């Protein structure tokens, strides 16, 4: 199957935005003729991938819920937060790493991610 064709088909049903998660490979955002690839956050040590996708989705939806408007820019930013939170989730078994996170940890990794993807 082809992810672009899949996204176009889903958008044909009336969906404005489509996000396809690709595990450690990040995600793809589709909007009109825009395809926005977002890489996963690279980690040297991955302990357990269980829950990474749920962490991605929770962070993405949480970020969007904190904003007054939903537009392409806020959705791109929400995907970045999703990738970052998914990267924390895989660092320990279960909720271990997520339970010990601080806002400073998240902010630091978000800045690392922004630096990594900007060119």
Regions found by a protein language model. Give the residues of each.
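Conserved phosphate-binding/catalytic region of the ribokinase-like
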Residues: 1-119
